Amino acid sequence: PVKSAKPENQKAIRVEWLDGVFVEFDKLATLGDKSRIHLKIVNTNADDCEVDLYSGNLTVINEKGEESPIVSVKLGSKFNDRRVTALIVPDLPTEMVIEVSKLQSVALLQLKDFKNNIVKLRGLK
């Protein structure tokens, strides 16, 4: 029998955002008074895809149902507190890190690009 690389209980949260472009939850890390949501953007298309994000269009709801303000966003090598853009190359996962004030878990993470494409990930720990 073929064994999965990940244990059964470590099922990755992966959601399609754009046509053929997925958002994968990696981990939630806390350092001091900040938490970082680590994600991967994966393009399964044959062509490159540009992702353009404004921090005001990102929503993070904590375990208490409160919206956590976005401190900064990193997408690939771009890092900013307002807007990031990156070219997502096929089959090469691009790291995305969203920094927010400290939280225990993410009840809801909503990403919306400038074309109003929305993706929601829930229950991130």
Annotated model-derived regions:
Residues 69-82:
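Short beta-strand and strand-turn-strand segments in soluble, beta-rich domains
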Residues 26-27, 82-88:
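Beta-strand-rich interaction surfaces with strong enrichment in secreted/lumenal proteins
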Residues 35-45:
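Short, well-ordered beta-strand segments enriched in hydrophobic/aromatic residues
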Residues 23, 37, 94-96:
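Hydrophobic residues positioned within well-ordered beta-strands of beta-sheet architectures
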Residues 2-18, 46, 51-65, 85-125:
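Surface-exposed edge beta-strand/loop patches
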Residues 22-30:
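Short amphipathic beta-strand and strand-loop transition segments with alternating hydrophobic
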Residues 32-36, 106:
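A generic structural signal for beta-strand entry/edge sites
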